[in-house]
Amino acid sequence: IYPVVILLMDAPGIRQELYDMASRIAACDYYVLCPNLYYRTAKPFEWNKPNLNFIEGYSPEASRELMFKNMDNLSNALVLEDINHMIEFCENQNSAKNSSVGLVGYCMSGPFAFYAAGKLPEKVAAAASIHGVKLVTESDDSPHLFTNSVKGELYFSCAETDSYAPLEMI
Protein backbone atom coordinates (compact mmCIF):
# COMPACT_ATOMS: atom_id res chain seq x y z
CA ILE A 1 0.00 0.00 0.00
CA TYR A 2 1.49 3.31 -1.15
CA PRO A 3 1.04 6.86 0.14
CA VAL A 4 -0.70 9.12 -2.37
CA VAL A 5 0.86 12.10 -4.15
CA ILE A 6 -1.20 14.29 -6.46
CA LEU A 7 1.04 16.02 -8.99
CA LEU A 8 -0.78 19.09 -10.29
CA MET A 9 0.21 20.26 -13.76
CA ASP A 10 1.59 23.62 -14.79
CA ALA A 11 0.07 25.89 -17.45
CA PRO A 12 1.35 24.09 -20.57
CA GLY A 13 -0.74 21.08 -19.53
CA ILE A 14 -0.15 17.35 -19.35
CA ARG A 15 2.89 16.25 -21.33
CA GLN A 16 5.70 13.73 -21.23
CA GLU A 17 7.78 15.79 -18.77
CA LEU A 18 5.00 15.56 -16.19
CA TYR A 19 4.62 11.84 -16.77
CA ASP A 20 8.37 11.52 -16.23
CA MET A 21 8.14 13.46 -12.93
CA ALA A 22 5.21 11.29 -11.84
CA SER A 23 7.21 8.17 -12.69
CA ARG A 24 10.17 9.36 -10.61
CA ILE A 25 7.89 9.99 -7.63
CA ALA A 26 6.19 6.61 -8.11
CA ALA A 27 9.61 4.92 -8.23
CA CYS A 28 10.05 6.09 -4.62
CA ASP A 29 7.03 3.98 -3.61
CA TYR A 30 4.22 6.50 -3.96
CA TYR A 31 0.82 6.16 -5.63
CA VAL A 32 0.81 9.13 -8.02
CA LEU A 33 -2.03 10.88 -9.81
CA CYS A 34 -1.30 13.49 -12.48
CA PRO A 35 -4.66 14.96 -13.54
CA ASN A 36 -5.46 17.07 -16.59
CA LEU A 37 -6.90 20.15 -14.88
CA TYR A 38 -8.11 21.49 -18.23
CA TYR A 39 -10.56 18.62 -18.77
CA ARG A 40 -13.58 20.92 -18.40
CA THR A 41 -12.66 23.23 -21.28
CA ALA A 42 -10.00 21.73 -23.51
CA LYS A 43 -9.15 18.59 -25.37
CA PRO A 44 -5.75 17.23 -24.40
CA PHE A 45 -2.99 18.99 -26.30
CA GLU A 46 0.77 18.69 -26.44
CA TRP A 47 3.33 21.44 -26.82
CA ASN A 48 5.89 20.76 -29.53
CA LYS A 49 9.34 19.57 -28.58
CA PRO A 50 11.99 20.45 -27.73
CA ASN A 51 11.37 24.15 -27.18
CA LEU A 52 7.68 24.22 -26.18
CA ASN A 53 6.85 27.27 -28.28
CA PHE A 54 3.58 26.15 -29.86
CA ILE A 55 0.79 23.58 -29.68
CA GLU A 56 0.48 21.42 -32.78
CA GLY A 57 -2.03 23.03 -35.14
CA TYR A 58 -1.71 26.47 -33.51
CA SER A 59 0.63 29.40 -34.06
CA PRO A 60 2.87 30.36 -31.11
CA GLU A 61 0.58 33.32 -30.35
CA ALA A 62 -2.59 31.21 -30.54
CA SER A 63 -0.93 28.55 -28.38
CA ARG A 64 -0.21 31.03 -25.60
CA GLU A 65 -3.73 32.46 -25.94
CA LEU A 66 -5.23 28.97 -25.57
CA MET A 67 -3.02 28.22 -22.57
CA PHE A 68 -4.03 31.45 -20.80
CA LYS A 69 -7.71 30.89 -21.65
CA ASN A 70 -7.53 27.43 -20.07
CA MET A 71 -5.77 28.85 -17.02
CA ASP A 72 -8.44 31.53 -16.63
CA ASN A 73 -11.13 28.83 -16.53
CA LEU A 74 -9.61 27.32 -13.39
CA SER A 75 -10.18 28.46 -9.83
CA ASN A 76 -9.12 27.39 -6.37
CA ALA A 77 -12.64 26.07 -5.76
CA LEU A 78 -12.76 24.00 -8.96
CA VAL A 79 -9.36 22.42 -8.38
CA LEU A 80 -10.24 21.77 -4.72
CA GLU A 81 -13.31 19.90 -5.96
CA ASP A 82 -11.06 17.85 -8.27
CA ILE A 83 -8.62 17.11 -5.45
CA ASN A 84 -11.50 15.94 -3.25
CA HIS A 85 -12.66 13.58 -6.01
CA MET A 86 -9.13 12.23 -6.46
CA ILE A 87 -8.84 11.60 -2.72
CA GLU A 88 -12.19 9.76 -2.79
CA PHE A 89 -10.96 7.73 -5.76
CA CYS A 90 -7.78 6.76 -3.91
CA GLU A 91 -9.75 5.71 -0.84
CA ASN A 92 -11.22 2.93 -3.01
CA GLN A 93 -7.92 1.73 -4.48
CA ASN A 94 -6.34 -1.30 -2.83
CA SER A 95 -2.81 -0.12 -3.59
CA ALA A 96 -3.32 3.46 -2.31
CA LYS A 97 -2.82 4.21 1.37
CA ASN A 98 -6.12 5.41 2.79
CA SER A 99 -4.89 8.43 4.71
CA SER A 100 -3.78 11.97 3.99
CA VAL A 101 -2.14 12.86 0.69
CA GLY A 102 0.75 14.92 -0.57
CA LEU A 103 0.23 17.64 -3.18
CA VAL A 104 2.79 19.08 -5.57
CA GLY A 105 1.89 22.17 -7.55
CA TYR A 106 4.01 23.76 -10.27
CA CYS A 107 3.70 27.41 -11.29
CA MET A 108 -0.04 27.94 -11.89
CA SER A 109 -0.91 24.96 -9.67
CA GLY A 110 1.29 26.01 -6.74
CA PRO A 111 -1.54 28.05 -5.22
CA PHE A 112 -3.96 25.15 -5.75
CA ALA A 113 -1.77 22.88 -3.60
CA PHE A 114 -1.39 25.60 -0.94
CA TYR A 115 -5.14 26.37 -0.96
CA ALA A 116 -6.07 22.69 -0.63
CA ALA A 117 -3.71 22.30 2.35
CA GLY A 118 -5.66 25.02 4.14
CA LYS A 119 -9.12 23.87 3.08
CA LEU A 120 -8.54 20.13 3.63
CA PRO A 121 -6.24 20.06 6.67
CA GLU A 122 -7.26 16.54 7.70
CA LYS A 123 -6.61 15.16 4.21
CA VAL A 124 -3.39 16.95 3.15
CA ALA A 125 -0.22 15.80 4.93
CA ALA A 126 2.10 17.93 2.82
CA ALA A 127 1.87 20.47 0.02
CA ALA A 128 4.65 21.83 -2.15
CA SER A 129 4.45 24.91 -4.34
CA ILE A 130 7.28 24.93 -6.85
CA HIS A 131 7.66 28.30 -8.58
CA GLY A 132 4.05 29.03 -7.58
CA VAL A 133 2.20 32.16 -8.66
CA LYS A 134 -0.73 33.94 -6.97
CA LEU A 135 0.10 32.59 -3.52
CA VAL A 136 -0.97 35.94 -2.02
CA THR A 137 -3.72 37.88 -3.78
CA GLU A 138 -6.51 40.34 -2.94
CA SER A 139 -9.13 37.62 -3.56
CA ASP A 140 -11.33 36.23 -0.79
CA ASP A 141 -9.97 32.78 -1.60
CA SER A 142 -6.29 33.72 -1.65
CA PRO A 143 -4.35 30.66 -0.44
CA HIS A 144 -2.48 32.61 2.23
CA LEU A 145 -5.75 33.37 4.06
CA PHE A 146 -6.09 29.70 5.03
CA THR A 147 -2.56 29.20 6.36
CA ASN A 148 -3.72 28.94 9.98
CA SER A 149 -5.86 25.91 9.07
CA VAL A 150 -2.95 23.94 7.60
CA LYS A 151 -1.93 20.91 9.68
CA GLY A 152 0.52 19.34 7.25
CA GLU A 153 3.93 20.43 6.03
CA LEU A 154 4.31 23.22 3.48
CA TYR A 155 7.22 23.73 1.09
CA PHE A 156 7.68 26.75 -1.15
CA SER A 157 10.29 27.15 -3.85
CA CYS A 158 10.28 30.57 -5.50
CA ALA A 159 12.36 32.28 -8.15
CA GLU A 160 14.39 35.29 -7.12
CA THR A 161 13.16 37.31 -10.11
CA ASP A 162 9.92 36.40 -11.87
CA SER A 163 7.45 38.74 -13.55
CA TYR A 164 4.64 36.20 -13.00
CA ALA A 165 5.38 35.94 -9.27
CA PRO A 166 6.65 39.26 -7.92
CA LEU A 167 7.72 39.44 -4.27
CA GLU A 168 4.37 40.82 -3.07
CA MET A 169 2.65 37.74 -4.54
CA ILE A 170 4.82 35.33 -2.59
Give a label for each model feature:
Residues 1-170:
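N-terminal cap/leader regions of alpha/beta-hydrolase-fold enzymes
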